[in-house]
Amino acid sequence: MNTDKATNRKTLIISTAFLLLAVVGGVVFYAEVKDTLQMVESERQKSSEFSRLADPQQPVHNILMSDIVADWNNFVIIDVREPEEYNEGRLKGSLNYRLGELLNNELARRNMIQQAGEKKRVFYCHDGDRSTLAASRIESEFGGTNYVMDLGFRQIQENDEYRTYWEGSTDILPGGKDYERTPVLKMEGLTASTLIDLSLQYKPQVRTLKGKTIIHAPILLMSDAQINAFIASLGTEPVIALCNSKVSCFSTRIFRYRLEQNGLKLSGLIRTK
């Protein structure tokens, strides 16, 4: 009898342990998936980080998708997102000139103007943040009327007619939530001495980063040449990125693409507040 009770008690303890592990594992898995989705989905919501960079003296003109559709053949859509975003899904016939190129590459700006011709220019990104910066830059140099689709993705996806002007997937980045997640690291025991800050504007880091060298690299605002030169300057130690905002966390995915294109890898990211 006592043997049976001991066996049952042992079985109960083991079962409880497995159940606890399953629950903890499930919570961790959910947290990882939720975090990945937040990182990717962040570009569908406007960010104060971009608005701080906008020139208040250089206003832009917002336009509705309904106005574009009504005069479709007289508009050209300039998609200022990253190539991976553009290749995943885009407005039909749109041109892809990423924001960093338009901000820093005069040849890219002139090529875009030449391709657009006499058509009215509409700058597009999912939320209107990057497109606002691009439109402001182009208007200051070339003049003309440059439109921005404010929350353009939402306008398109909420209307059956507008969706016919979209081609490809509605996922923001390749792989969606199934994309292999970049490891999230802790400062304790971290041997890398250099961390990459991907935020749009540099700001002092929290005290837990004391003793680390912080390199500011806002890749969404950098040209292709600037990004490649920066990556070429990195040493041989693991590449670790800081994720301290929606935009910088989103940028970790883009940074990872660029590293992989250069035969490197993003070893991990550290979240700070």
Describe each region flagged by the PLM:
Residues 2-65, 71-75, 83-120, 126-193, ...:
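Rhodanese-like catalytic fold shared by cysteine-dependent sulfurtransferases
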